[in-house]
Amino acid sequence: MCGIVGYIGNKDAFPILIKGLRRLEYRGYDSAGVALVNSDTALNVYKSKGKVDNLVEYCSDKNVSGTVGIAHTRWATHGEPSALNAHPHYSESGNLAIIHNGIIENYSDIKKKLMANGVKFRSETDTEVLVQLIEYIKEHKNLDLLTAVQVALHEVIGAYAIALLDKRTPHQIIVARNQSPLVVGIGDDEFFIGSDASPIVEYTDKVVYLEDGNIAVLHKGEELKVVNILNRRLNPEIQTVDINLGQLDKGGYPHFMLKEIFEQPDCLTNCMRGRVNVDTDNVVLSAIIDYKKQLINAKRFIIVACGTSWHAGQIGKQMIENFCRIPVEVEYASEFRYRNPVITSDDVVIAISQSGETADTLAAVKLAKDNGAFIYGICNAIGSSIPRATNTGSYIHVGPEIGVASTKAFTGQVTVLTMLALALAKEKGTISSSDYLEIVKELHEIPEKMKKVLELNDRISELSRIFTYAHNFLYLGRGYSYPVALEGALKLKEISYIHAEGYPAAEMKHGPIALIDSDMPVVVIATHNAMYEKVLSNIQEVKARKGKVIAIVTEGDDNISRIADEVIELPTTIECLEPLLATIPLQLLAYHIAVCKGKNVDQPRNLAKSVTVE
């Protein structure tokens, strides 16, 4: 993995490919490369370690002419980060070039077979094995390129999204997908390729999201041809994407992450638009209207997710159980799919993923669906794989999230889970009218209260400078605030590279308290709710051991203000909605500490935005 771009048409391909790679930088990568076929049918492949800027500099004195090309940003999976292991990879003859996202699981067996037949390899990657296999089949069986690709992919086990060039047929690109996203943009006598739509939308809003097992032939001057591995012609749906190009730029902010933190009030307004009606004091989700029977009669909900989405799921669990009186389990998708879980037709599985392409979550959806469960998706990326695989669901509608560390997607996911719990509870009759109306009205007020929290940015920026020395942080919360503590710790780890752990506050005495000393900052979410007094006792225990307390409190709190080292006050809200406000100071704290330490906030080391391989 991580990013695929391609172009075939009448324009110079190189600038389109480079701009496309820049659009995909948010996904994370360690090297980049490009392959172009020029008018003399020469195949030129250029690769470099590091950023796209390095590739552009390397190509500054190279022949980058041509109207057909493919390009790639790579996160190392097989073979170390290097120019040699970067994509594109080319065949032994130099006729074919390929880019690939995914993992070929049986690459070692295929490589041994090819080496036994005299094929020589340059790199350590599974991707080179694939291009060598395609050429070997093409030449030894005297097949055309499409048929050779179909035969080769029949031998392959694993996930892939590929784009393939042959300099002998310079007017076509062949692409294929299995368990890794791939989008084809359709322009005026031209085609575009992307891992997602972001490299494409500047040129066309007409796209085809390839399905697993699809192989597409992009031939200049012809219609898009899509077939399966058995060469049966398919008729994919051409969709219209609506992405504002301004959402793909920083908009005057120094980093995408800060921009996206500040976008959250507007994002939540968009998320609730047409769903939360304050005039009628009602929450309406089309999924519950269309699939009321399946959702109301469910005996159990299972939430599957990874990372930040898993934390949102933990908040959703508490709301669904509290309001709907349905038992809820929250599972890491990577564990769920491999532990032979008990799944029945009475279960509703909620799959949460910002990208809609998270490999483990997608596999968990397939497992649950195969076992008869009803699947509800909560995603951000419209047209992505998980929404297409589910029975129904809700988009969070927060716009493209470019920063690798999720911010607005988290609050969008929590908002959708809140609306789902409220709407379902009302249908089931498990929530009182007064509680329902109070929460609906307060939910509508959350975006304005978020704006007040964001006014604390300068204060949190100053506070962050005090704690850049720390090598460890502890985050504590109880009830709805415990997942917020987990999320705050994750944000700090992701972008500042400071070790941090989130714990239920009461569990501090069962181990973590041994770590607390004068060098240990402890972030405590201590808003004024039912467990306030107990959390106050935890803070006193931290202070007794000389720990430095950063307390997130409800405005007007005098008790904690007297004992905590630093206090951040939040507007008053209902307990179940506190995560939507309390998470923002933790996002800002992580951001400003990372900036103070000189870290790459938008592209932290070793992390990819969309984890499309296991």
List each language-model region with its residue ranges.
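Conserved short alpha-helical segments that host acidic/polar catalytic motifs at enzyme active sites
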Residues: 1-250, 254, 269-300, 338, ...
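Glycine-rich oxoanion-binding loops at beta->alpha junctions
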Residues: 67, 71-84, 279-292, 316-352, ...
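Structural motif
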Residues: 68, 96, 300-302, 348, ...
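Acidic/histidine-rich
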Residues: 156-190, 463, 468-494, 531, ...
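Active-site phosphate/pyrophosphate-binding segments
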Residues: 264-268, 272-302, 392-521, 594-614
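Glycine-rich phosphate-binding loops that contact phosphosugars or nucleotide phosphates
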Residues: 296-438, 442-445, 525-566, 589, ...
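Generic C-terminus detector
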Residues: 548, 561-563, 573-614
